[in-house]
């Protein structure tokens, strides 16, 4: 049965401030709680809910919890419309507004803490689970298994953009919360997601590393599948995402060995070199040393050109994409160095 009324949803929205202090009791009739954080992406959320409503698992065996990290009445009405659309044919559906703190980590924590099942399934509002997603994952969670990672499919164009290729690489990693199942007791023992991470990827990697350190029994399956279409990012997205390097510093501080093994083997020395020769060129210009300035400019052009070539390799060579790569390759090294050093200072860690 689908439980939702507009009045109930509005009350939940208004009284969500204390929700993180409450633990919902386990309901033995509900085997799995699906947590879907959302950020005002109505079309994508609608597609995700449609896919969840079509699950082959019996509706009474699972519930759906939508956590709105940007609470507004548009998302509220979209979720409530599913009651009218599905009537009593669908699973229990809960809308939960997240008044803050915000971010994927906080939203996911709000969701699993009100879940009624012992098994928590995480996906994204942009993901489309296969009809047998839940039915395929549950048997893998045997008594001795703590968590399960499923398969994420990302349809990729023959010549993707550099950003899309990077997104595919991240989703092809061994752990991603777009398709993740975990026992509630494990989440409680670990304290859930670390809400200090504003970036979803950092919070996911942190939980993954904690599970590996625990150690938890983490299993991968190719049978539980979600599809996550690659979105078209705004122009210059690769530059704006550099600010997440601040969170990378915290991740490195918490898990230095695993960070070097699984994320980045060492500092991006090429960025530091490009910034250094640019600094030499500027300083030489100020001090009227034209020969040194010219050498610095040439070295900077060579380094920036090498970065452009690397980023364009195997990606789209459309005029718009090439222009974006050229401009952002000029900006990325100094901004990357700035945000990495900002993270190192903020979290007092030697992170380069």
Located regions from the model:
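Catalytic donor/gating beta->alpha subdomain of glycosyltransferases that bind UDP-sugars
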Residues: 194, 199, 205-261
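Acidic donor-binding segment of Leloir-type glycosyltransferases
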Residues: 50-97
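N-proximal low-complexity "stem/linker" segments adjacent to membrane-targeting elements
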Residues: 2-54
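Short aromatic/hydrophobic "clamp" motif used to bind/position activated sugar donors
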Residues: 120
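Conserved donor NDP-sugar-binding/catalytic core segment of glycosyltransferases
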Residues: 128-160, 229
């Amino acid at each position: 049965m689908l439980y939702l009324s507009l009045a109930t949803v509005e009350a939940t929205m208004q009284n969500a401030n204390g929700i993180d202090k409450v633990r919902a009791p386990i309901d033995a009739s509900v085997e799995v709680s699906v947590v879907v954080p959302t950020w005002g992406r109505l079309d994508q959320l609608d597609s995700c809910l449609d896919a969840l409503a079509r699950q082959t698992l019996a509706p009474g065996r699972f519930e759906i919890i939508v956590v709105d990290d940007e609470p507004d009445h548009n998302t509220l009405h979209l979720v409530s419309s599913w009651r009218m659309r599905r009537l009593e044919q669908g699973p229990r559906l809960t809308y939960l507004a997240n008044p803050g703190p915000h971010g994927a980590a906080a939203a996911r924590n709000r969701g699993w803490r009100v879940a009624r099942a012992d098994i928590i399934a995480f996906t994204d509002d942009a993901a489309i689970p296969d009809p047998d997603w839940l039915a395929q994952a549950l048997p893998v969670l045997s008594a001795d298994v703590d968590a399960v990672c499923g398969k994420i499919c990302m349809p990729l164009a023959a010549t993707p953009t550099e950003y899309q290729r990077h997104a595919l690489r991240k989703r092809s990693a061994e752990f991603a919360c777009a398709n993740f199942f975990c026992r509630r007791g494990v989440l409680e023992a670990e304290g859930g997601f670390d809400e200090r991470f504003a970036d979803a990827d950092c919070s996911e990697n942190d939980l993954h590393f904690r599970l590996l350190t625990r150690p938890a029994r983490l299993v991968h399956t190719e049978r539980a599948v979600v599809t996550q279409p690659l979105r078209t990012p705004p122009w210059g997205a690769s530059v704006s995402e550099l600010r997440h390097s601040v969170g990378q510093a915290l991740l490195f501080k918490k898990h230095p060995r695993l960070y070097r093994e699984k994320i980045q083997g060492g500092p991006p020395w090429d960025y530091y070199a490009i910034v250094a020769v640019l600094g030499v060129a500027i300083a030489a210009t100020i001090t009227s040393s034209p020969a040194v300035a010219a050498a610095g400019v040439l070295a900077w052009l060579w380094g920036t050109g090498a970065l452009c070539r690397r980023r364009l390799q195997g990606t789209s060579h459309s005029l718009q994409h090439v222009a974006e790569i050229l401009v952002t390759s000029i900006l990325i090294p100094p901004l990357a160095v700035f945000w990495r050093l900002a993270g190192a200072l903020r979290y007092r860690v030697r992170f380069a």
